Amino acid sequence: MSRSVKKPPFCAPHVLRLANRVIASNRTSVVINIHSRSSVILNKFVGLTFGVYNGKTYVPVKVTDNIVGRKFGEFSPTRRFLGHAGDKKVSRKG
């Protein structure tokens, strides 16, 4: 089910607070480290760089016009695919 049209997009309050602080100081080159993968990327974040935590490291996400409206977690994968298991060769004796 999609989100109700009446509700605004969800963005964690601490993410908004950190972004507003960086915007007010005009230091757009600083990386804002966040854990909130479920927060929606807003228009005011364009030009900022966020470090989205994937459980191990902070993955840098540069916000552009193309990714506004999507969630931070989409750009920080939590699992690494190592490939499917190969066929095990059965060794026969004798």
From Swiss-Prot:
Family: Belongs to the universal ribosomal protein uS19 family.
PANTHER family per UniProt: RIBOSOMAL PROTEIN S19P FAMILY MEMBER, SMALL RIBOSOMAL SUBUNIT PROTEIN US19M
Annotated keywords: Ribonucleoprotein, Ribosomal protein, RNA-binding, rRNA-binding
Source organism (scientific name): Anaplasma phagocytophilum (strain HZ)
Function as written in the Swiss-Prot or TrEMBL entry: Protein S19 forms a complex with S13 that binds strongly to the 16S ribosomal RNA.
An annotated GO BP: ribosomal small subunit assembly
Protein name, as recorded: Small ribosomal subunit protein uS19
NCBIfam families: rpsS_bact
Xref: InterPro entries: Ribosomal_uS19 (IPR002222), Ribosomal_uS19_bac-type (IPR005732), Ribosomal_uS19_CS (IPR020934), Ribosomal_uS19_SF (IPR023575)
Gene Ontology molecular function, alphabetical: rRNA binding; structural constituent of ribosome
Annotated signal sequence range: none
Gene Ontology cellular-component annotations: cytoplasm; small ribosomal subunit
